[in-house]
């Protein structure tokens, strides 16, 4: 199977009315931060890509800016129901041609730099996620690091349990980073890394998915943990990432 991977197009800042190219692939995977609001991302994929291949889409943090997670997920699922070829996943999976795709935003556990309590305080002060995102609209609740931690734990449990249940060929798609090797070297030691990445080494090594595809960082990466290949192919803001390949296709 050939998988077309990209993330972090950030259409809310630099509009692309349609992809510059649609490569020869069997499945399109979008690892978050496509645009503002999950439903808008679903509609963009339904209009521009789904005619060519099935689409796997997970929300990034920016999908929820100036909105809420609860209602955003509900709206994304409702929109995806209109497009049989667009699969919007949050702690959910879909089978395509014998390959299982697991999807979740993932968020973080704030532990990767070794000071989770301090990292949560730092994230609350520094991350726009906790200024521009609500957990829910009615009744209104702010999205706080404690909620991100809880949601991360829920996603980690989902991924672990499904990977253990049946060892079939699997692709995991998350927005947040699953391993420290995905953190760009220029940010080494930065406490804010804990709001971007978590160490899921055990999940990866025990579950052994064929691929783990993610976004969030605006730096390309491609490496292995055990038998699992981990990739990120983000565009970033405008043409921020010069290594971005809009037609990247990987095999599974």
Question: Model regions: which residues?
Answer:
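Glycine-rich phosphate-binding loop signature in dinucleotide/nucleotide-binding domains
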Residues: 22-23, 96, 162-168, 206
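Binuclear metal-dependent phosphoesterase catalytic core
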Residues: 81, 184, 190-210, 218-252
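Beta-strand-turn-beta hairpins that frame and shape the catalytic cleft
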Residues: 1-4, 93-103, 224-229
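N-terminal active-site segment of His-dependent metallophosphoesterases
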Residues: 1-58, 64-73, 135-138, 142-145
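Active-site neighborhood of phospho(di)ester-bond hydrolases with catalytic His/Asp-centered motifs
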Residues: 5-7, 28-33, 56-61, 87-91, ...
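Active-site environment of divalent metal-dependent phosphoester hydrolases
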Residues: 10-16, 36-40, 62-73, 93-95, ...
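Active-site-proximal loop/helix segment associated with metal-binding centers of metalloenzymes
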Residues: 102-171, 178-187
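A basic- and aromatic-enriched beta-loop-alpha substructure that forms the phosphate/nucleotide-
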Residues: 56-122
């Amino acid at each position: 199977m050939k998988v077309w991977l990209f993330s972090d197009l950030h259409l809310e800042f630099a509009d692309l009315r349609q992809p510059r190219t649609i490569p020869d692939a069997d499945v399109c995977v979008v690892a978050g931060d496509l645009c503002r609001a999950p439903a808008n991302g679903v509609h963009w994929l339904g209009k521009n890509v789904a005619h060519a291949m099935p689409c796997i889409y997970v929300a990034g943090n920016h999908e929820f800016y100036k909105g809420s997670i609860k209602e955003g997920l509900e709206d994304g699922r409702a929109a995806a129901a209109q497009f049989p070829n667009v699969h919007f996943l949050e702690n959910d999976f879909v089978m395509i041609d014998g390959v299982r795709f697991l999807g979740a935003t993932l968020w973080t556990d704030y532990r990767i730099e070794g000071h989770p309590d301090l990292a949560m305080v730092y994230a609350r002060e520094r991350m726009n996620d906790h200024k521009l995102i609500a957990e829910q609209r009615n009744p209104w609740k702010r999205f706080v690091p404690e909620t991100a931690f809880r949601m991360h734990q829920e996603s980690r449990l989902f991924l672990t349990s499904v990977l253990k249940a049946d060892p079939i060929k699997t692709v995991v798609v998350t927005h947040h980073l699953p391993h420290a090797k995905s953190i760009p070297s220029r940010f080494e030691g930065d406490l804010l890394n804990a709001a971007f990445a978590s160490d899921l080494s055990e999940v990866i090594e025990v579950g052994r998915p064929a691929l783990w595809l993610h976004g969030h960082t605006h730096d390309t990466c491609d490496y292995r943990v055990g038998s699992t290949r981990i990739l990120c192919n983000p565009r970033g803001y405008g043409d921020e990432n010069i290594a971005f390949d809009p037609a990247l296709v990987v095999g599974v």
